[in-house]
From Swiss-Prot:
Membrane topology: Peripheral membrane protein
Enzyme class: translocase
Cellular localization per UniProt: Cell inner membrane
Recorded family membership: Belongs to the ATPase alpha/beta chains family.
Organism encoding this protein: Histophilus somni (strain 2336)
Record GO terms (molecular function): ATP binding; ATP hydrolysis activity; proton-transporting ATP synthase activity, rotational mechanism
Catalytic activity from the UniProt record: ATP + H2O + 4 H(+)(in) = ADP + phosphate + 5 H(+)(out)
Pfam families: ATP-synt_ab, ATP-synt_ab_N, ATP-synt_VA_C
InterPro entries found in the cross-reference section: AAA+_ATPase (IPR003593), ATP-synt_VA_C (IPR055190), ATP_synth_F1_bsu (IPR005722), ATPase_a/bsu_AS (IPR020003), ATPase_alpha/beta_chains (IPR050053), ATPase_F1/V1/A1_a/bsu_N (IPR004100), ATPase_F1/V1/A1_a/bsu_N_sf (IPR036121), ATPase_F1/V1/A1_a/bsu_nucl-bd (IPR000194)
GO cellular component: plasma membrane; proton-transporting ATP synthase complex
Protein role: Produces ATP from ADP in the presence of a proton gradient across the membrane. The catalytic sites are hosted primarily by the beta subunits.
Protein name: ATP synthase subunit beta
Length: 457
């Protein structure tokens, strides 16, 4: 193991000088005598390497001794990681002792080759009406939850984890990338209460941590998920939030001496996203189904970060502030959300027709809103009045009480099977429930509950 010394410190970026004949390779992990781990990013020539600190650089000084480990960062993988909380280096942060894993894998790995990849069209039922109907998930697919600040990305993700972990008995890996520590804590307790903690590995690099941790923690979580996949399992990989992964790259990019690109993002934005996303894939041995929350800065979906993420996804669930302001949760926009699976060959003709019918009525209602605002409801034709009435029922029926939000709402959570979802919306489209007041459709599960609620009104 060769040794060098620190010659420059600028925030999270540190230059280390080594003997000319023992310069570390890019992505090698270096250990400072204070215990801090660095990751080599660039070789500057003259034996100097530029590194990112994976931890706080407080208290470092020039001249400190640095040793080259000769390998990339390696993290524990396998069943020993289940039920544990780890940091970017795979070290436990839950005060439950050592992980005790038999195997350690490097976090930088090649994506599966073209021959190894598999394509599946099997659907994954989530129990959330709007998602199962409008933007169904594929097993082994990639899903993005897009939304601005405070529209419910994390709550939706927690509900998905709860529903899928209870209904589907596979393992999950959760990577908390630059999110609030409070949410990480809530999440841990939610998993404990639902009795699914022993099926989840948690990897956290939260908001208060240096950019190096936030940049690499997604790869740490992904490496653990890849191990489960390569053992022949179907694994779920949750990332909250993919935007902070991009942001961490932006923070270190300028310090690494790169010119910024559009909106100040790093010039390597598309490549960094591709390196992560191409590894999140299903092979012939097992599958990784990933759900990624994507923060949308200033609700602008054309921002380079969310726009780059769109290209990699099979299903996009767009959360809308307008729908949240109506008090309809989950605030999924049924006209903006899409899925590659919404195809009659995959979901069947009935599901496809009902989903398109729902979107058609909501689109017509959106067009009529301007007329209603200026002239009022009375000026509409009878057909349009019927469209508006049904659209308002559909809007309300797309809401649903969540299990993870029971504490806040006071109403018990509901899991609705895909069969019941299609039957309910088909009934509304066919006019079977035209006589029922729209309030009865708000915050319920299946259509039977609507009829029960209507009787009490």
């Amino acid at each position: 193991m060769s040794a060098g010394k620190i010659i420059q410190i600028i925030g999270a970026v540190i230059d280390v000088e080594f003997p000319q004949n023992a310069v570390p390779k890019v992505y090698d992990a270096l250990k400072v005598e204070s215990g801090l781990t660095l990751e080599v990013q660039q070789q500057l020539g003259g034996g100097v390497v530029r590194c990112i600190a994976l931890g706080s650089s407080d208290g470092l000084k020039r001249g400190l001794k640095v040793e080259n480990t000769g390998n990339p960062i390696s993290v524990p993988v396998g069943t020993k990681t289940l039920g544990r909380i780890m940091n970017v280096l795979g070290e436990p942060i839950d005060e439950k002792g050592e992980i005790g894993a038999e195997e350690y894998w490097a976090i930088h790995r090649a994506a599966p080759s073209y021959e190894e990849q598999s394509n599946s069209t099997e659907l994954l039922e989530t129990g959330i009406k709007v998602i199962d109907l409008i933007c169904p998930f594929a097993k082994g697919g990639k899903v993005g939850l897009f939304g601005g600040a405070g529209v419910g990305k994390t709550v939706n993700m927690m509900e998905l984890i709860r529903n899928i972990a209870i209904e589907h008995s596979g393992y999950s890996v959760f990577a908390g990338v630059g999110e609030r520590t409070r949410e990480g804590n809530d999440f841990y307790h939610e998993m404990t209460e639902s009795n699914v903690l022993d099926k989840v590995s948690l990897v956290y690099g939260q908001m208060n941590e240096p950019p190096g941790n936030r940049l690499r923690v997604a790869l740490t979580g992904l490496t653990m998920a890849e191990k489960f996949r390569d053992e022949g399992r179907d694994v779920l990989f949750f990332v909250d939030n993919i935007y902070r992964y991009t942001l961490a790259g932006t923070e270190v990019s300028a310090l690494l001496g790169r010119m910024p690109s559009a909106v100040g993002y790093q010039p390597t934005l598309a490549e960094e996203m591709g390196v992560l996303q191409e590894r999140i894939t299903s092979t012939k041995t097992g599958s990784i189904t990933s759900v990624q929350a994507v923060y949308v800065p200033a609700d602008d979906l054309t921002d380079p970060s969310p726009a780059t993420t769109f290209a990699h996804l099979d299903s996009t669930v767009v959360l809308s502030r307008n729908i949240a302001s109506l008090g309809i949760y989950p605030a999924v926009d049924p006209l903006d959300s899409t899925s590659r699976q919404l195809d009659p060959l995959v979901v069947g003709q009935e599901h496809y027709d009902v989903a398109r019918g729902v979107q058609g009525i909501l689109q017509r209602y959106k067009e009529l809103k301007d007329i209603i605002a200026i002239l009022g409801m009375d000026e509409l034709s009878e057909d349009d009045k019927l469209v508006v009435a049904r659209a308002r029922k559909i809007e309300r029926f797309l809401s649903q009480p969540f299990f993870v939000a029971e504490v806040f709402t006071g109403s018990p959570g509901k899991y609705v099977s895909l069969k019941d979802t299609i039957r309910g919306f088909k009934g509304i489209l066919d006019g079977e429930y035209d006589h029922i007041p729209e309030q009865a459709f708000y915050m319920v599960g299946s259509i039977e509950e609507v009829l029960e609620k209507a009787k009490k009104m």
